[in-house]
Amino acid sequence: MQVFTLFSKFKKALTRAILAFIATIIVCTPAQAAEVVNGKLHLRFAIAPMRPTPSQTIKEFEPIFKYLADQLGATYEIVSPESWAAISVAMTNGHVDVGWLGPWGYVLSNKKAGTEVLATVKYRGEPFYKALIVGRADLPIKKWPEDAKGLKLSLSDQGNTSGWLIPMAYFKSIGIDPASYFEYREGATFGQNESQIQHGLIDLGSDMDRGRNGMIEAGQIDPSKSKIVWESSKLPNDAISVPKDFDPALKARITEILTSLSEEKAQSLMGSGYNGFVKAKHSDYKVIEDAGRILGKL
């Protein structure tokens, strides 16, 4: 009986020791430690759909991620989903180490999973851009939005900042429900919106100034076949983001590498017009949070 009692006490003590050891490992191990493969840091990169197709996006923007990986002595993999919402979900679910997220995608991921912004992308020297509503060139719109009532309007997916969030917040602020005011649809990419306008399949579609400029410069759309009928005020540009509890030293190094690039060097590594990064903090995206609250999404 005494032997059994001693064994029982030893077993309980051993169990407590094991549980304490496991707890120590959980506390001391970073929640988002970067993966190491064959002795080298391995990073999972993801970039929002900057161009009409994922292959075009990766072709134009992979060089900046390769540069970052090379500077860190890391290997990498890179993906570009077809929707702005998808990359936010991937970041939120822990499938991305460093993500180029749209402003709204970043805010949503921050709200759900504590995602942190390190830097804001510069476009033509500024960390800002504008949301657009583009229309067919022949539309007789003199007074907006009154003259557009009943027209075919296409917005982007609900994870898209300039393609959905900002136009929807604008319409709500002036008392318009797009679903009843227009012949309304949503979920298209910017490239699809611009293409359908070019071919007369829709009357109006959302876009962003930098995306439209890029498609014009690449010869993908004819600017004479469309016109801008509405634009937003300046919005904070895309967010270079990492998961909550990402390695602090690695965060600092990534921020330093990106923000120290000259505009000339940065432009050589990215799509047309994109030429650098500036340090960022969450409060820089307050205007995006405000729009989300207007629509009851936060």
From Swiss-Prot:
UniProt keywords, alphabetically: Signal, Transport
InterPro entries given in the database record: PhnD (IPR005770)
GO CC terms: ATP-binding cassette (ABC) transporter complex
CDD domains reported for this sequence: PBP2_PhnD_like (cd01071)
Name of the protein in its database record: Probable phosphite transport system-binding protein HtxB
Superkingdom per UniProt: Bacteria
Similarity field: Belongs to the phosphate/phosphite/phosphonate binding protein family.
Function: Probably forms part of a binding-protein-dependent hypophosphite transporter.
